[in-house]
Amino acid sequence: MGFLNGYFLWVKAFHVIAVISWMAALFYLPRLFVYHAENAHKKEFVGVVQIQEKKLYSFIASPAMGFTLITGILMLLIEPTLFKSGGWLHAKLALVVLLLAYHFYCKKCMRELEKDPTRRNARFYRVFNEAPTILMILIVILVVVKPF
């Protein structure tokens, strides 16, 4: 990856852009689940929300997740000494794995809502919506402060 050495900061900038896009989608998608669950009895409304869920997941969240992973891996390949910079990186990567699990669980929620919109109530999705915020806060603290 020597040919990319001079581009580390560019890759990092695109990584930040991708993360922002991914997080925006993960913040909004469960809010759509809330609307979906609250209005399960309104077929037309549910139809519109389902389209929004699918488009947000397929055209924003998933590509942003992929680009986040690609640029993150590229940064580690360009600068492998990051692995030796402290335990903060390993903790961050563990939290990223949780974000990935959350991302794919959102897809499962979409399928469940499509089959049975009354399976979980809106309150569940409101609480569920907090997870990416908490993970993001922890990741940002680890990356900026590098506490260990």
From Swiss-Prot:
Q: Which reaction does it catalyse?
A: protoporphyrinogen IX + 3 A = protoporphyrin IX + 3 AH2
> A single GO BP annotation from the record?
protoporphyrinogen IX biosynthetic process
Q: What is its EC number?
A: 1.3.99.-
Q: What class of enzyme is it?
A: oxidoreductase
* Membrane spanning residue stretches: 7-27, 58-78, 86-106, 128-148
Quote the InterPro entries the UniProt record gives.
HemJ-like (IPR005265)
The superkingdom of the source organism is: Bacteria
Q: Which UniProt keywords apply?
A: Cell membrane, Heme, Iron, Membrane, Metal-binding, Oxidoreductase, Transmembrane, Transmembrane helix
Parts forming coiled coils: none
Q: How is the cofactor bound?
A: Binds 1 heme b (iron(II)-protoporphyrin IX) group per subunit.
List the record's Gene Ontology CC terms alphabetically.
Answer: plasma membrane
**Cofactor(s) needed by this chain:** heme b
Is the keyword Iron assigned to this protein?
A: yes
Molecular functions (GO terms): metal ion binding; protoporphyrinogen oxidase activity
Positions bound to heme: 15, 92
Q: Which family does it belong to?
A: Belongs to the HemJ family.
State the NCBIfam families in the record.
Answer: protoporphyrinogen oxidase HemJ (TIGR00701)
Give a short account of what the protein does: Catalyzes the oxidation of protoporphyrinogen IX to protoporphyrin IX. Is involved in the biosynthesis of tetrapyrrole molecules like heme. Does not use oxygen or artificial electron acceptors such as menadione or benzoquinone.
Q: Show the HAMAP family listed in the entry.
A: HemJ
Q: How does it assemble?
A: Homodimer.
Q: What is this protein called?
A: Protoporphyrinogen IX oxidase
Q: Whose protein is this, by species?
A: Helicobacter pylori (strain ATCC 700392 / 26695)
